Amino acid sequence: MQLPRVTLRQMTWTTSAIVLLGITLLLWSAFRHQESTLAIRAINQGTTMPDGFSVWHHLDANGIRFKSITPKNDTLLITFDSSAQSAAAKVVLDRTFPHGYIIAQQDEDNQASQWLSLLRDTSHRFG
């Protein structure tokens, strides 16, 4: 029994196909992971933060799903699977909470955005 001989052309096509498949999978996983975060902060220092249960109640009543609600420093962070869910939650929470709160979307979870914002913030130090 003889094994077929692999030519250089076949090896090149096979290697190219494997590399292309790998790049496609890498790009797909990067685009698929698009978490979005809402941050709720009080404008005035004396204003108390809303508790996570009330936020959960309002989002659940409007059919908006979220991944987590986490207090961090003086901010309440709400993580969503997509920017669309985050935008819908922002509309609901803007209606729900009084004007003493800032509700802002934070979609800069990837490292490229963090590096760009770091470079933008520190550009005045050069020269």
From Swiss-Prot:
The keyword Cytoplasm belongs to this UniProt entry's keyword annotation: no
GO cellular component: plasma membrane
Cytoplasmic side: 1-9
A Pfam family per the record: SecD-TM1
Keywords in alphabetical order: Cell inner membrane, Cell membrane, Membrane, Transmembrane, Transmembrane helix
Entry-linked InterPro entries: Modulator_MzrA, SecD-TM
Chief location category: membrane
Function: Modulates the activity of the EnvZ/OmpR two-component regulatory system, probably by directly modulating EnvZ enzymatic activity and increasing stability of phosphorylated OmpR.
Family (UniProt): Belongs to the MzrA family.
Protein name: Modulator protein MzrA
Gene, per the UniProt record: mzrA
